[in-house]
Amino acid sequence: MRNVTRSHMVLHQIQSVLKKYEEVSAQELYESLDKGTVQREFGVRSVDLSRLSVSEEQFSELLLLFKLYSDQQQQSSIEFVATVPSEVDVRLRKTIAVIREMIHGAQNTILVTGYAVSEYVDEIMERVLEKALAGVNVDIFLDRNPQTDRYIENIRGRNLPSNFNVYVYKGSQGYSSLHAKVIMVDEEKAFVSSANLSYNGIVNNIEIGTLVGGEKILVIKNVLLELVKNNYFEKIIWYA
C-alpha cells in the first residue's frame, strides 16, 4: 500500500512539472538531462524528493519518459468509421454513433460542413444548436440546395445566439458545389467522411470515413476560412 501511495505522489509531481513546462519539447528536456542541468532548468530541485524515495536522476528520467509519452499521445491519430449493413462484421464504429459522440462531447467549438442536410438529421442539428446555446462556438458550412434552404427556414426566427454561424456556398465557375463532409470538435478531432447528413448517408448507403486527431486537422478549418475570406460563402444574417 505504501508503494502505491508513493507511486501516486511521484506521478503527481511529474504531472505538475510537465504542466509547468508544457511548452518545452522532449528534445530540450533530453538535452538538459544529458548535460545534467535538468534539475536547475526544470525546477526539479524544488520537488521534495526525500518524500518520494527517488533520486534527482531517477525523477528526471521519469520526467523525460512521461514527456515522450505525452507528446506521442498528442500526435495525429486515425480511426476508420463506416456505414455498412448490420450483418457485415467489419469491427468499425458506425457513422451515426461517432457523430453523436463528437457533438455530445464538444466543449468549445463545433465545425460542420455538408452538401445535404435532410430532415432525418434534424435531431442531430438540434443538438448542435443546443451546444451553441450553451456557449460552444458553432460554424456550419452548407451547399446551396433545397435541403439547405429548408434547414435555414426551419431555424430562422428562433432565438439563435451570435456564436451560431451558418455559411452557404455561393458557387463559382469551375467549382459547382460544396461536397466536403466534415465534423470537427474543439479543434482536436475531425470526422471526414463520404456520408452526407441524410438518411442515405448515415443509414442506407455504404459509406466510409476517418476520425482524425492532432494539430494537422486545423488545415481543414484554415481552408474554409480562406474560402470565406475570398467571398465563396454567404454568411446567413439572422437578424436585420
Swiss-Prot record:
Principal location: cytoplasm
Knocked-out gene: effects: Differentially required for bacteriophage defense; when this gene is missing the DISARM system still confers resistance against phi105, phi29, phi3T, SPP1 and SPR but reduced protection against Nf and SPO1 in B.subtilis.
Ranges of residues in domain PLD phosphodiesterase: 174-201
The keyword Cytoplasm appears for this protein: yes
Keyword Cytoplasm attributed: yes
Keywords associated with the record: Antiviral defense, Cytoplasm, Hydrolase, Restriction system
Residues annotated as catalytic: 179, 181, 186
Protein role: Component of antiviral defense system DISARM (defense island system associated with restriction-modification), composed of DrmE, DrmA, DrmB, DrmC and DrmMII. DISARM is probably a multi-gene restriction module, this subunit is probably a phospholipase or nuclease. Expression of DISARM in B.subtilis (strain BEST7003) confers resistance to phages Nf, phi29, phi105, phi3T, SPO1, SPR and SPP1. Protection is over 10(7)-fold against phi3T, 10(4)-10(5)-fold against Nf, phi29, phi105 and SPR, 100-fold against SPO1 and 10-fold against SPP1.
GO molecular function, one term: phosphatidyltransferase activity
Localization, UniProt: Cytoplasm
Full protein name: DISARM protein DrmC
Family under the similarity heading: Belongs to the phospholipase D family.
One GO CC annotation: cytoplasm
EC number: 3.1.-.-
Pfam families hit by this protein: PLDc_2
GO biological process: cardiolipin biosynthetic process; defense response to virus; DNA restriction-modification system
InterPro entries documented for this protein: PLD-like_dom (IPR025202), PLipase_D/transphosphatidylase (IPR001736)
